[in-house]
């Protein structure tokens, strides 16, 4: 019951259609990467690739540290996972060039504001430009809002300030206010990619984690935290 309530509330806040709960930001970003690959295979792409950004940080699992743009995080864990194409952050032309040269791309994974990369804030047209590129190429736009989500920027999601709707969005950190819970949310076609048994998490969506996340949502609403960010 708590898991269902949390899914409904967070989807209402974000405009998403479905939720998968796990225990950390790395886990939900791993979920997003797996979803993108599954989406690619469903579209007949044999070796699906995800565009990621220089100086990004997405986690420390093998796939997410590969997606991370920091050699210090990756050092000693080679060989890294294939299936990623890297572009400079805040450079639409570079992503356009990848679109023209690489026909195995199925998604973009990007932070609306880079945190560990140095608090890099993109130009106002960057996220809308990525949304347009994804629409034109039938890619998924996947936003890592582990750092920026949960009312930290004046809206529940940072991308909402740019008027951008992602296909997939990930949440953690402030989502449970210190309790280990994360969410991978998806909408439209992306929400229908996984079927029964496609993915799982032993403790994902456990009652205590969901209760903590619901209490955080209550506090955000009752204390008008978006107005005070």
Predicted segments, located by residue:
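Conserved N-terminal phosphate-binding loop of PLP-dependent enzymes in the Aspartate aminotransferase
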Residues: 1-229
